[in-house]
Swiss-Prot record:
NCBIfam families: PRK04204.1-2, PRK04204.1-3, RNA_3prim_cycl. The keyword Protein transport does not apply. The gene is rtcA. It catalyses: a 3'-end 3'-phospho-ribonucleotide-RNA + ATP = a 3'-end 2',3'-cyclophospho-ribonucleotide-RNA + AMP + diphosphate. One of its GO terms (cellular component) is cytoplasm. The active site is at H308 (tele-amp-histidine intermediate). Keywords: ATP-binding, Cytoplasm, Ligase, Nucleotide-binding. Catalyzes the conversion of 3'-phosphate to a 2',3'-cyclic phosphodiester at the end of RNA. The mechanism of action of the enzyme occurs in 3 steps: (A) adenylation of the enzyme by ATP; (B) transfer of adenylate to an RNA-N3'P to produce RNA-N3'PP5'A; (C) and attack of the adjacent 2'-hydroxyl on the 3'-phosphorus in the diester linkage to produce the cyclic end product. The biological role of this enzyme is unknown but it is likely to function in some aspects of cellular RNA processing. It is an enzyme of class 6 (ligase). Transmembrane segments: none annotated. PANTHER family: RNA 3' TERMINAL PHOSPHATE CYCLASE (PTHR11096), RNA 3'-TERMINAL PHOSPHATE CYCLASE (PTHR11096:SF0). ATP binds at Q103, Y283, L284, A285, D286, Q287. This is RNA 3'-terminal phosphate cyclase. SUPFAM superfamilies: EPT/RTPC-like, RNA 3'-terminal phosphate cyclase, RPTC, insert domain.
C-alpha cells in the first residue's frame, strides 16, 4: 500500500492551487493524500463549486475513494484508483473556471489507457484564471514540444459571474516526455491585441484597443462580437510573439470600470513582462512545473516567482522524486530541475 501524503491547505498561497496539484499528482502516482485547511487563506474558505467539480472529476476518471467532497469542506481524503481514458462531461454549475478543472484532470489522462475527451461547462472568462485561449495558444504549443498532445476548443463563452460557457479538450496518452528549455524569449516578432464583447457596446472595445495601441505597436487589432446571450462580458487580451515563445496576457472587464482603466491594467502587466528578459509570464510558469517534473529535466526563466509557483513546486516535490532549483540572476529567476 502506498504511503498517505498529508498536506496543509494553508501552505503557500493558501488557495485552490494546492488541491488541484495534489489531485493531479495523486492520480498520476497512485499515492493517496489528505488535505486540511482547504483554501484557508481565502475570505470564503473550503471547497467552492469549481473545486468540488475538480474533485469529483478526478474521482470519476480514476475511480477514487473520496471523503469530504462537499461544498464548504476544509478537509479531503483522496485515494486514487486506475486512470481510465474516455469521454467525460462535468458541469461546475457556476462561473467557476472551466480551465482550472481541465488543468486538474488532463495531466492524469496523459497516462491513461487510451485517448480521452473532457468537456467542462462553467466560466471561461474569469479574472482569477487563465482563459481557454491562453491554454490553446500559449500552453498547448509548448506541451506539444514536450511530447504532450492535447487540443482545447472553446465551444461557448461564459463570462463571470453568469457562467454558461463550455470548453472541451481532446488528449492522447504520452509515449515519452521531452525536455523544454526556455531560458530566453528572444526578440519580439509581433504583438496582437484582441477584445471580446458580449452584450457590451462596441465603442468599449474600440477604446480598449486604442489604449493598447497607444502603448504598443500592434500588428493586429481584432474585435470579436459574441452573441448577447453569452454575456454580458468583455475580455481584453494582448499576445506577445517572440522568437522562442508566445505569451498571452488578459484582463476581464468589470462593471463601472472604464474601458481605458481596464486596458491600462493590461498595459501595465505586459510592460512588466517586457521589462525583464524572462521567457515566461506568471500564469504560464505555474502550468510548466508539472510537465517539467514529469520530464525529469528542463528549465524556464520568470521575472518573479509567484506564490502560486512556489506552492506548486512544493506540492510536486512531495509526490515526485524531483527537486527544483530557483536561481536569481540579472533580474530574472531561472527555474530548473536539479
Amino acid at each position: 500500500m502506498k504511503r498517505m501524503i498529508a498536506l496543509d491547505g494553508a501552505q503557500g498561497e493558501g488557495g485552490g492551487q494546492i488541491l488541484r496539484s495534489a489531485l493531479s499528482l495523486s492520480m498520476i502516482t497512485g499515492q493517496p493524500f489528505t488535505i486540511t485547511g482547504i483554501r484557508a487563506g481565502r475570505a470564503k474558505p473550503g471547497l467552492l463549486r469549481q473545486h468540488l467539480t475538480a474533485v469529483k472529476a478526478a474521482a470519476e476518471i480514476c475511480r477514487a475513494t473520496v471523503e469530504g467532497a462537499e461544498l464548504g469542506s476544509q478537509r479531503l481524503l483522496f485515494r486514487p484508483g486506475t486512470v481510465r481514458g474516455g469521454d467525460y462531461r462535468f458541469a461546475i454549475g457556476s462561473a467557476g473556471s472551466c480551465t482550472l478543472v481541465l488543468q486538474t484532470v488532463l495531466p492524469a489522462l496523459w497516462f491513461a489507457d487510451g485517448p480521452s475527451r473532457v468537456e467542462v461547462s462553467g466560466g471561461t472568462d474569469n479574472p482569477s484564471a487563465p482563459p481557454a485561449d491562453f491554454i490553446r495558444r500559449v500552453l498547448e504549443p509548448l506541451l506539444a514540444k514536450m511530447g504532450i498532445h492535447q487540443q482545447t476548443t472553446l465551444l461557448r463563452h461564459g463570462f463571470y459571474p453568469a457562467g454558461g460557457g463550455v470548453v472541451a479538450t481532446e488528449v492522447s496518452p504520452v509515449a515519452s516526455f521531452n525536455t523544454l528549455q526556455l531560458g530566453e524569449r528572444g526578440n519580439i516578432v509581433q504583438m496582437r491585441g484582441e477584445v471580446l464583447l458580449a452584450g457590451v457596446p462596441r465603442h468599449v472595445a474600440e477604446r480598449e484597443i486604442a489604449t493598447l495601441a497607444g502603448s504598443f505597436s500592434l500588428h493586429e487589432q481584432n474585435i470579436h462580437n459574441l452573441p448577447r446571450d453569452q454575456g454580458p462580458g468583455n475580455t481584453v487580451s494582448l499576445e506577445v510573439e517572440s522568437e522562442n515563445i508566445t505569451e498571452r496576457f488578459f484582463v476581464v472587464g468589470e462593471k463601472r470600470v472604464s474601458a481605458e482603466v481596464v486596458a491600462a491594467q493590461l498595459v501595465k502587466e505586459v510592460k512588466r513582462y517586457l521589462a525583464s528578459t524572462a521567457a515566461v509570464g506568471e500564469y504560464l510558469a505555474d502550468q510548466l512545473v508539472l510537465p517539467m517534473a514529469l520530464a525529469g529535466a528542463g528549465e524556464f526563466t520568470v521575472a518573479h516567482p509567484s506564490c502560486h509557483l512556489l506552492t506548486n513546486i512544493a506540492v510536486v516535490e512531495r509526490f515526485l522524486p524531483v527537486r527544483f532549483s530557483l536561481i536569481e540572476t540579472d533580474g530574472v529567476t531561472r527555474v530548473s530541475i536539479e
